[in-house]
Amino acid sequence: MSQRTAPAPFLLKTYQLVDDAATDDVISWNEIGTTFVVWKTAEFAKDLLPKYFKHNNFSSFVRQLNTYGFRKIVPDKWEFANENFKRGQKELLTAIRRRKTVTSTPAGGKSVAAGASASPDNSGDDIGSSSTSSPDSKNPGSVDTPGKLSQFTDLSDENEKLKKDNQMLSSELVQAKKQCNELVAFLSQYVKVAPDMINRIMSQGTPSGSSLEELVKEVGGVKDLEEQGSYNDNDDKEDDDEKGDTLKLFGVLLKEKKKKRGPDENIETCGGRGKMMKTVDYNGPWMKMSSPAGESSKVCN
């Protein structure tokens, strides 16, 4: 077998990608130039891999590195090393050989070395579909990291959203408890609802504004307020009675007291203003006066 004079296309493109200073924020050499680090795997797979290798699969890139003898240095960082892949020593790339992969035949259990039948020319830029994983590809570097990073980002965003929703719900809960306490105090003080009845109301849930009056009437909280003497019927407060007293709960009218009508009041009215009218019987016997003969009738004022 003749000695290779040019590096494999995959190695050459990878070296150019790492050595490009314009992409150091995504992929670059380490400080001493003996390894290279992929700092941003998502941007690397999205922007750089399609430009150099016509695909965007970071896992395929890692598997291809494994077939050329690269190894992952630390588990928590995408840092790879090869003794013949160093900064400023591009000529060493020709010494990097593609590892031979062994495939088993379906008929009889014999194994054939696939790399032995392959020429040096076809072992270059076959990243992705043509290469099979070597035993070293089972290391952490072969994990589908871009997918996990995307999932982690989505989960982080969802977590922040849930935190905001939780804060908003906590604030609404405090407000609801405050309104509940006000309702219990009102029912106990003004409507005279027993504590066990309040517990039954609370177990049924907070009523809406439209059904609040029906619920209060159902538990017997508001009966006839005139009969209970809840309103002051004093004659000294006639002006207030003319206006009418109302009982509201959270803006819902529970009871309105109208002015009582006296037992001796005449119900006859005159005109639209409802003014009371009195009638006089001019034909009554007291309206007729008899005077002695010869004397004129006089009306005394």
Swiss-Prot record:
Homotrimer. This is Heat shock factor protein HSF24. SUPFAM superfamilies: Winged helix' DNA-binding domain. Signal peptide: none annotated. The gene is HSF24. It comes from the Eukaryota. Residues 103-160, 221-244 are annotated as: Disordered. It is found in: Nucleus. DNA-binding protein that specifically binds heat shock promoter elements (HSE) and activates transcription. Residues 7-101 bind DNA.
